[in-house]
């Protein structure tokens, strides 16, 4: 359930601003929509602490401090760590530059540029060139040019000359570097020594990661405090703030305001207010979806639906059908058991894993799929659990493979039709209560979707369908959508009718899209079959190894089924989540563009 929110305006004496902010943070129920930027010093410090945290992760070991350092003790450590990281960066850049320069000089051998500069100071302006054999011969024959032949560099004749050569000769001059190869190598070695020193310090500093995390949290809280402080407005000795609170917290706010002697006003959010935060109230069942929503980073809009219950139900079924193997479900169940025993209390994510594991085992048992092994059907108990027309090995039950595939595909289309029809019913219910005539358009969509289901069966499965009544229902649904799709409480009947007729072509395209939406649920069948085929392929590969090569067979099974599980989990994200977030949510008209309710309070965890 999405909790109702109230807009609250809070006014206090300007001299009480700090007390106001402190009390609001302690209260922890007011959400501020448009906040000003936090003080730059807090933002810069948090960014630096984040960089330190990332840098020290690679040095983190088992031994860590038992308690964070005090603020006073942390500051010298913070400065020393910042200096060390800056020094490490400089040394790495210097080492890279020295290595690259030394690499370029490798073919020139080890020489001292300093000695060449000393010769130049004594009047010997030496220039080094590379050229071809013909030019080298011409230079040697020129009485006006004095050259010294050097060893070839890069298979090209090389020479030294006193003073620059005339521009008439095609030669490439070698610029004398500031440092020789030997000096550069020594410089690189010095950098390595400095980096080892930095590494030793960072290894020791990694033990203080808890202190860094503690300071990150404090800095983040300070940044939020300064942001709210900067958001407040003041005039004539008064300071005021505007935010949102859950309606259920209104009485608690009023008591706190009376104790603090604040002036306040409370009202419902305006109809066009798009900054209202969304606070979803979960029950014991729907809270299982929190980890999924957190991973996806989606929040329903304040005026949208809370579909967490339906999302959980369909997501669980989609997960089971996509993974499709009871053996894999047993592995997930074992993982859930281990995590539960290890933590002694199952987190929400682990509870969700329990549910998904059991659902996968049930679906796999109904289809007779156990690690892709056909031999599992020789076990009477496992065989007795199978629904024959759902069986992935239909020959064991006297069912033709075409019949089995058509049954699964039909089940997928039924799921799609039920889910999309549910969305229409939810829209009808809400709009009917709001006296919004566009509920008739959703009734039209309901009729069209249910009729299009039979069209899908006719085209995909080849089921005999009387298309004339189906076409009539689709046309009737189309007309209802066109006539009433533009209606809304703030429009007259004529205005709504005009808007609906103007969108007739769009409705036509959306009707075709509705057909495609039902068709898209076939992905559950396709991905499940692909997963089974992959499992069978690896099983057959492993069967080819016997005797001493049985170890190779075990490796093939572990790697093959491991990859299949990973691909299945990715498919759940790509396909299972998509059907909920796009097809189902699209039919509901949800955009998932909500703003998560984030009240002003002192957090005990770092916000990402």
Go through the PLM ranges and name each one.
Residues 1-6, 18-32, 251-608:
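Conserved, carboxylate-rich catalytic/transport cores that coordinate ions
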Residues 1-310, 339, 346-350:
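Long, charged N-terminal accessory/stalk domains
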